[in-house]
Amino acid sequence: MAMGVPRVILLCLFGAALCLTGSQALQCYSFEHTYFGPFDLRAMKLPSISCPHECFEAILSLDTGYRAPVTLVRKGCWTGPPAGQTQSNADALPPDYSVVRGCTTDKCNAHLMTHDALPNLSQAPDPPTLSGAECYACIGVHQDDCAIGRSRRVQCHQDQTACFQGNGRMTVGNFSVPVYIRTCHRPSCTTEGTTSPWTAIDLQGSCCEGYLCNRKSMTQPFTSASATTPPRALQVLALLLPVLLLVGLSA
């Protein structure tokens, strides 16, 4: 009978540890969706999940610059590095924006709830100045969303004298969607927009000059550079491995 006492104590301690671990878990809202216009989550009853450390919410938006956005909204457990820097290129088009927020109390990821969290990515110049170029404009997550029959004709603003068409991928954490776009652009055709350790927009495409010249078919599949380039962590590990082996042999 006495032999069973330590086992009972061990089981009780193990159960207490499980209870303690469970009590330390955070309750975070869980949600992901793609929007093609203004959104408002305030009236929605969002599901919640248990997270080990921190809650997370993020918004990533890409716009033609002519009142046509695609916006990714994601809430859940914090993933990825605990800190990082958002990088942006003021000369890049199409216009984009990302905001990421982490927090450490129950259901605290309820701040980014409406389209008001985003700036106006279709700001018309004041005074209105046209470049003289005219291009097709569209954006969507399917090739058919950017068929010529579904694309608008827009008069381009200011220094946007070229037309652009391309495709790519928008990513927030592990939530990712394809994107297809036609719009106005500058002759430099710079597309590297806002990036961070938690969000990314990878676009490839081409610019042209001429009346409605961005009319080619959207049939080319997008291939991200990350598919052929090893992640940075693996590159660093590959560089450090020979050094670690030498240290181990000399010890």
UniProtKB/Swiss-Prot annotation:
Topology versus the membrane: Lipid-anchor; GPI-anchor
Propeptide feature: residues: 226-251
Primary site of residence: membrane
Residues annotated as domain UPAR/Ly6: 135-214
Family annotation (InterPro entries): CD59_antigen_CS, LY6_UPA_recep-like, Snake_toxin-like_sf
Keywords recorded for this protein, A-Z: Cell membrane, Glycoprotein, GPI-anchor, Lipoprotein, Membrane, Signal
Keyword Glycoprotein applies: yes
Residue positions the entry lists as glycosylated: N120, N174
Gene Ontology CC terms, in alphabetical order: extracellular region; plasma membrane; side of membrane
Residues annotated as signal peptide: 1-25
Lipid-conjugated positions (GPI-anchor amidated alanine): A225
Gene3D superfamilies xrefs: CD59
Cell compartments where the protein resides: Cell membrane
Protein source organism: Homo sapiens (Human)
Name the UniProt record assigns to this protein: Ly6/PLAUR domain-containing protein 5
Disulfide bond residue pairs: none
